[in-house]
């Protein structure tokens, strides 16, 4: 079978020019053709000028590739009007109106005041918005990281609760214990701090002074300090003085009272205040308890640091974002506590009349004070409370060494005792508080409320120390850094008087609950055999554990600290 024959069609070839022939054949008649017109707007093969047609969507792309359309034309074909109308100018030939120059001056003065007011408002808005911008940027970064975490699966494997048992896997911050627990220590009891809020021991009368056991001399308060304000601040001076840090068992007065049967439970005001405010504390602390016969001594460990964890003046402990315990820089919890200690020691000495005659108690010096080193500027009163019958049916008689910082002339020239403490501002942008230098004069209550919220445990301890000592008034100071990046220089911005009983109700400090907590701890220790025990607040959970300690625990630390003190004296 023969295959079909393939024949090529004949094509018209223009040998004398470019383009089709002038006379088309019959084969080309069905093909439409339009003659070339010079008025047509012809685009280019690659038009890089007409960029306005790129990224068009939907019906906007209609007719953009039609021959002669405006979308294919370059800007070189656009019509430009040659006449420049900017050269024309209208001339006002009317006669100007005469104006009152005094009125113009008043108008200009009013405009100037408005401009200055707007400028001041703008500056305040900029200062206030700086922190807001920082918080917004941090929130955006956290939101971005959270979205990235969700894209990668999130906590799908762990359900709604992640590691640590908290919603979204929010693990608690790592806090170090105040003392390292050793394997030979035995846990005898765990006390849940959340249950402490339900305890109450009502009808506890005020403490009584024990005989003539009142020691020291105090200076009168300098009332010129009350004129201090943010605008009239004064620098915090570095006042020389002695600070005595005597434990309960080393106090010769307490030893004498214990031998004389003055009580069966002994402690200092700061130790008892720490126990009574335990539900408010966040950081770890520890208290040593000695059971000797039918008596109980609450004591503190001898550490190489200036202060024991019980006496540490924590800063922003109960805030939403507390400082890291041992981080880099000057704003870690340990260095801030040391700074607060020096501020309080200098503040309580600066606000009294150190060169004038003071008020002397029945004994000018305490037995543990050294005559050669000088006075400490602190008075000590030994007081006693009856806390009812204990677990063995015998009455619980509490003996406490309390401290006072100054005296002041009250109504009728009556001498009243003072407890002097100071708040310290370190960096308002990091502490979550308010700027004292802008808010303290006009919003003192808001600043105090913020400090009470961020330092709930410390403020409660101060109030309890004043109540245990029978202090008539508390004097609170506000001390701020001159430079947020330096801890060398500080200024006193303001001072404030508060009554201890009224202040306790303002900070929701219930004395019946505090006595109930202390009595619960005393009963737990009294149930144990004579020996040495340790009460330690857990750093991660609201729990106090009672440990039984072997004989000789912490004795090496005591000996090493004594050797260091003897070397310093030499």
From Swiss-Prot:
Cross-referenced Pfam families: eIF-3_zeta
Superkingdom per UniProt: Eukaryota
Localization annotation: Cytoplasm
Region described as RNA gate: spans on this chain: 309-323
Keywords: Cytoplasm, Initiation factor, Protein biosynthesis, RNA-binding
Presence of keyword Protein biosynthesis: yes
Record's keyword annotation contains Protein biosynthesis: yes
GO terms under cellular component: eukaryotic 43S preinitiation complex; eukaryotic 48S preinitiation complex; eukaryotic translation initiation factor 3 complex
Example of a GO MF term: translation initiation factor activity
Region (Disordered): 150-175, 551-570
Signal peptide as annotated in the record: none
Record field: compositional bias (Low complexity): 151-160
Gene Ontology BP annotations: cap-dependent translational initiation; formation of cytoplasmic translation initiation complex; translational initiation
Record's compositionally biased regions (Acidic residues): 560-570
Main location: cytoplasm
Family: Belongs to the eIF-3 subunit D family.
Domains: entry comment: The RNA gate region regulates mRNA cap recognition to prevent promiscuous mRNA-binding before assembly of eif3d into the full eukaryotic translation initiation factor 3 (eIF-3) complex.
Function text: mRNA cap-binding component of the eukaryotic translation initiation factor 3 (eIF-3) complex, which is involved in protein synthesis of a specialized repertoire of mRNAs and, together with other initiation factors, stimulates binding of mRNA and methionyl-tRNAi to the 40S ribosome. The eIF-3 complex specifically targets and initiates translation of a subset of mRNAs involved in cell proliferation. In the eIF-3 complex, eif3d specifically recognizes and binds the 7-methylguanosine cap of a subset of mRNAs.
Subunit organization: Component of the eukaryotic translation initiation factor 3 (eIF-3) complex.
Matching HAMAP family: eIF3d (MF_03003)
Protein name: Eukaryotic translation initiation factor 3 subunit D
The species this protein was found in: Caenorhabditis elegans
């Amino acid at each position: 079978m023969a295959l079909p024959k393939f024949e090529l069609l004949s094509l018209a070839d223009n040998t004398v020019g470019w383009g089709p022939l002038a006379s088309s054949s019959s084969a080309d008649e069905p093909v439409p053709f339009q003659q070339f017109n010079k008025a047509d707007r012809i685009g280019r093969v690659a038009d890089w000028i007409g960029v306005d047609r790129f990224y068009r969507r939907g019906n906007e792309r209609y007719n953009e590739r039609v021959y002669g359309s405006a979308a294919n034309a370059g800007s070189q074909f656009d019509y430009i009007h040659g006449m420049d109308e900017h050269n024309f100018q209208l001339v006002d030939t009317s006669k100007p109106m005469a104006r009152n120059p005094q009125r113009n001056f008043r108008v200009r003065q009013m405009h100037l005041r408005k401009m200055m007011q707007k400028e001041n408002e703008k500056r305040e808005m900029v200062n206030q918005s700086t922190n807001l911008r920082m918080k917004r940027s941090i929130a955006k970064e956290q939101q971005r990281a959270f979205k990235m975490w969700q894209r990668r699966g999130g906590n799908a494997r762990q359900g709604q609760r992640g590691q640590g048992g908290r919603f979204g896997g929010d693990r608690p911050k790592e806090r170090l214990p105040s003392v390292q627990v050793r394997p030979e220590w035995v846990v005898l009891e765990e006390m849940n701090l959340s249950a402490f809020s339900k305890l109450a021991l009502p009808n506890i009368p005020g403490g009584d002074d024990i005989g003539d056991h009142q020691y020291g001399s105090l200076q009168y308060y300098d009332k010129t300090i009350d004129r201090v304000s943010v605008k009239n601040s004064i620098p915090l001076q570095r006042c020389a003085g002695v600070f005595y840090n005597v434990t309960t068992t080393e106090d010769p007065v307490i030893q004498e009272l214990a031998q004389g049967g003055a009580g069966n439970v002994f402690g200092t005001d700061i130790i008892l205040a720490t126990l009574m405010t335990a539900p408010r504390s966040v950081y770890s602390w520890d208290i040593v308890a000695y059971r000797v016969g039918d008596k109980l001594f609450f004591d503190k460990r001898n550490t190489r640091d200036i202060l024991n964890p019980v006496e540490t003046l924590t800063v922003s402990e109960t805030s939403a974002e507390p400082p890291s315990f041992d981080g880099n820089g000057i704003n870690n919890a340990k260095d801030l506590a040391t700074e607060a200690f020096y501020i309080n020691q200098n503040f309580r000495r600066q606000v009294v009349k150190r060169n004038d005659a003071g008020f002397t108690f029945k004994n000018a010096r305490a037995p543990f004070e050294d005559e050669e080193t000088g006075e400490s500027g602190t008075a000590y009163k030994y007081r006693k409370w009856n806390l009812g019958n204990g677990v063995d049916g015998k009455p619980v008689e509490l003996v406490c060494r309390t401290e006072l910082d100054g005296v002041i002339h009250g109504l009728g020239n009556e001498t009243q005792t003072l407890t002097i403490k100071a708040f310290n501002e370190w960096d308002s942008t990091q502490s979550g508080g308010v700027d004292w230098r802008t808010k303290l004069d006009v919003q003192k209550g808001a600043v105090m409320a913020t400090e009470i919220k961020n330092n709930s445990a410390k403020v409660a301890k101060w109030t309890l120390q004043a109540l245990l000592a029978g202090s008539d008034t508390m004097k609170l100071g506000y001390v701020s850094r001159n430079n947020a990046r330096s801890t060398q220089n500080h200024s006193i911005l303001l001072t404030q008087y508060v009554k201890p009983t009224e202040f306790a109700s303002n900070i929701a400090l219930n004395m019946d609950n505090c006595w109930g907590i202390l009595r619960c701890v005393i009963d737990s220790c009294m149930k144990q055999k004579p020996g040495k025990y340790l009460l330690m607040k857990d750093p991660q959970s609201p729990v106090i554990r009672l440990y039984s300690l072997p004989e000789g625990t912490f004795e090496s630390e005591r000996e090493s600290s004594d050797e260091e003190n003897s070397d310093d004296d030499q």
